Amino acid sequence: MFCFWRTSALAVLLIWGVFVAGSSCTDKNQTTQNNSSSPLTQVNTTVSVQIGTKALLCCFSIPLTKAVLITWIIKLRGLPSCTIAYKVDTKTNETSCLGRNITWASTPDHSPELQISAVTLQHEGTYTCETVTPEGNFEKNYDLQVLVPPEVTYFPEKNRSAVCEAMAGKPAAQISWSPDGDCVTTSESHSNGTVTVRSTCHWEQNNVSDVSCIVSHLTGNQSLSIELSRGGNQSLRPYIPYIIPSIIILIIIGCICLLKISGFRKCKLPKLEATSAIEEDEMQPYASYTEKSNPLYDTVTKVEAFPVSQGEVNGTDCLTLSAIGI
């Protein structure tokens, strides 16, 4: 009779847990194990949470008035296990999980849910909530997997080829192309569990100018369009944003230099003309003085002042020269 009552009470608690569970937590890939020879009821759940988001893990939804002890057993990969426990009768809270960013979602006397405010790769592991009641123990296991969206890059290469890369994703991303080409895909695993996938494709058809790289991942899908190169000049396209500004700057500098040179010439020519005029003016007084003081200038003046005929010159050359005083 006692066993029948205990089994009936256990069934009521199970029905209550199933009815209330959907109101607070959403569990995926859930499997339930129930051994009829033991009052222990166990539920195994796999949960995938994106990195940087909040995770909320729930125990069996059993009224706290029926619970005696609620214990979270946390086993993170690469770290020793720790526990967070709450005794209902004494309302005492005990924890050995300090510094791991794992706490009660609220006060345990209100709700025994566990909260991770910002999920990181270090939070991967198993989380077990064990609820002890007079009717039996209820255990809920979570296998927490952290999702990391990949960083996607893509670029064209020579000879009508293109590269698409999904870096550091968890799990590994899937890369496909449209239209299909001759593709080679490689992957590289990292120490933190992330994977980098790189796909290189080549298209022989000349009528294919644009292709699409499709990256599929649990955190979301991406479709990227790439224009294939048509010749060697396409390899310069990534450098065009740097080449054009450099050419413009060189043109501006050249114009400034030409303006400075032309302005210097205009300023220099008037100075040269003014200098020549000053030198000529300075020479004129000296020439006047020389002309006045030199007897040779007087003689020439006299000869020019008294011209003679041709016959007189022929007959009286010596007399004339003597008379003049030469």
Curated annotation (Swiss-Prot):
> Where does the Ig-like C2-type domain lie?
138-229
- What is known about the tissue distribution of this protein? Expressed in granulocytes, monocytes, most T-cells and a subset of NK, NKT and B-cells (at protein level). Expressed in the spleen, lung, liver, testis, bone marrow, lymph nodes, spinal cord, kidney, uterus and small intestine. Expressed in mast and dendritic cells. Expressed in the lung of N.brasiliensis-infected mice.
Transmembrane ranges? 239-259
Keywords of this protein's UniProt record, alphabetized? Cell membrane, Disulfide bond, Glycoprotein, Membrane, Receptor, Signal, Transmembrane, Transmembrane helix
Cited CDD domains: IgV_CD200R-like
List the Extracellular topological domains. Answer: 26-238
| Subcellular location, record wording | Cell membrane
Q: Which residues lie on this side of the membrane: Cytoplasmic?
A: 260-326
Which residue positions does the secretion signal occupy?
Answer: 1-25
The topology of this chain with respect to the membrane is: Single-pass type I membrane protein
Spell out the disulfide connections.
Answer: C58-C129, C82-C97, C164-C213, C183-C201
Cellular component (GO) terms are:
external side of plasma membrane; receptor complex
- Record InterPro entries: CD200R, CD80_C2-set, Ig-like_dom, Ig-like_dom_sf, Ig-like_fold, Ig_sub, Ig_V-set
Q: Which residues form the Ig-like V-type domain?
A: 51-136
Q: Which domain of life is it from?
A: Eukaryota
Q: Which SMART domains match?
A: IG
| Glycosylated residues, chain numbering | N29, N34, N35, N44, N93, N101, N159, N192, N207, N221, N233
Q: What quaternary arrangement does the UniProt entry report?
A: CD200 and CD200R1 interact via their respective N-terminal Ig-like domains.
Q: Into which family does the record put it?
A: Belongs to the CD200R family.
| Summary of the function given for this chain in its UniProt record | Inhibitory receptor for the CD200/OX2 cell surface glycoprotein. Limits inflammation by inhibiting the expression of pro-inflammatory molecules including TNF-alpha, interferons, and inducible nitric oxide synthase (iNOS) in response to selected stimuli.
Instruction: Write down what this protein is called.
Output: Cell surface glycoprotein CD200 receptor 1
User: Highest lineage ranks of the organism?
Assistant: Eukaryota, Metazoa, Chordata, Craniata, Vertebrata
